[in-house]
Amino acid sequence: MVKFLLLALALGVSCAQHQNLEVSPSEVDGKWHSLYIAADNKSKVSEGGPLRVYVKHLECSDECQTFTIKFYTKVENVCQEHRVVGRKGKDGKYITDFSGQNYFHVVEKADDTMTFHNVNVDDSGKTNVILVVGKGESSSIEQKQRFEKTAEKYDIPKENIEHLVTTDTCNQ
């Protein structure tokens, strides 16, 4: 019986670590900036990678059943603007197409920052990506440390973390 209870507790803690946080339009709508990004497949978020995104604006509507993201990517140092609309699925994750199928949700909110977890599925397989965006264009040591802990929860090595502020030259 004790083993069963310990297993149930471990499963509950594991699920709680990957829960979807609810957001409201007042928390989301407006200008945002990408601060950090990381992925279990680092090439996807390295300079020139298809999932290295520079977020500029977020908006949710219909009680956050849809989530619109305006962002840029860079191809050969040329900024390309994109706008995607994620629709909330029954599991609470938003679904959209960009460089494959994407399933994303907010995993942390704090100090004018939000952290997203995204699962990108394309022809090469599945990639776990985490991204932290902020209302400001800089980040603190504490924010980076929180991001490192979040990366660890998703089995993304610290060395796969990319600081985006210094490489964001789009729409300035």
Curated annotation (Swiss-Prot):
SUPFAM superfamilies: Lipocalins. InterPro entries: Calycin, Lipocalin, Lipocalin_CS, Lipocln_cytosolic_FA-bd_dom, OBP-like. It is found in: Secreted; Cytoplasm. GO terms for molecular function: odorant binding; small molecule binding. GO terms for cellular component: cytoplasm; extracellular space. Coiled coil: none annotated. It comes from the Eukaryota. Glycans are attached at N41. The keyword Chaperone does not apply. It holds the Pfam family Lipocalin. Induction: Repressed by androgens and estrogens (at protein level). Repression by estrogens and androgens does not occur in immature 20-day old animals. Disulfide bonds join C60-C64, C79-C170. Residues 1-15 form the signal peptide. This is Male-specific submandibular salivary gland protein. It comes from Mesocricetus auratus.
